[in-house]
């Protein structure tokens, strides 16, 4: 299994979630976060924002589905402007459902 963490623009979060659902990946967690990337914040005239609001999406999928999920997020979250986000993929050793105590996805 893989954990996909996508840091995206908040205004694209619904579009990305809908695209993932349409592609067969309805399960996700969304978290409002703030942070900065390589650009170290953003300046508008004389106002400087050190940290920028983003949305983090967490999705756990089978190994074979990871690249497809990355493609869906990349396409649906794209604006072409600085700050579109970043996607991270990590291995997941196991998953358990709390209610049923079932193991796996």
From Swiss-Prot:
It holds the Pfam family P-II. SUPFAM superfamilies: GlnB-like. One of its GO terms (biological process) is nitrogen fixation. GO terms for cellular component: cytosol. Transmembrane segments: none annotated. GO terms for molecular function: ATP binding; enzyme regulator activity. InterPro entries: N-reg_PII, N-reg_PII-like_a/b, N-reg_PII/ATP_PRibTrfase_C, N-reg_PII_CS. Keywords: Nitrogen fixation, Transcription, Transcription regulation. Belongs to the P(II) protein family. Could be involved in the regulation of nitrogen fixation. This is Nitrogen fixation nifHD region GlnB-like protein 1. It comes from Methanothermobacter marburgensis (strain ATCC BAA-927 / DSM 2133 / JCM 14651 / NBRC 100331 / OCM 82 / Marburg) (Methanobacterium thermoautotrophicum). The lineage of its organism: Archaea, Methanobacteriati, Methanobacteriota, Methanomada group, Methanobacteria.
């Amino acid at each position: 299994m893989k954990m996909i963490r996508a840091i995206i623009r908040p205004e694209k979060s619904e579009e990305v979630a809908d695209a993932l659902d349409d592609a067969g990946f309805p399960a996700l967690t969304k978290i409002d976060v703030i942070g900065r990337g390589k650009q170290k914040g953003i300046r508008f005239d004389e106002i400087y924002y050190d940290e920028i609001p983003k949305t983090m999406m967490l999705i756990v999928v089978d190994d074979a589905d990871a690249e497809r999920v990355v493609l869906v997020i990349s396409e649906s979250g794209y604006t072409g402007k600085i700050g579109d986000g970043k996607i991270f993929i990590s291995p997941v050793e196991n998953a358990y459902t709390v209610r049923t105590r079932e193991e796996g996805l």
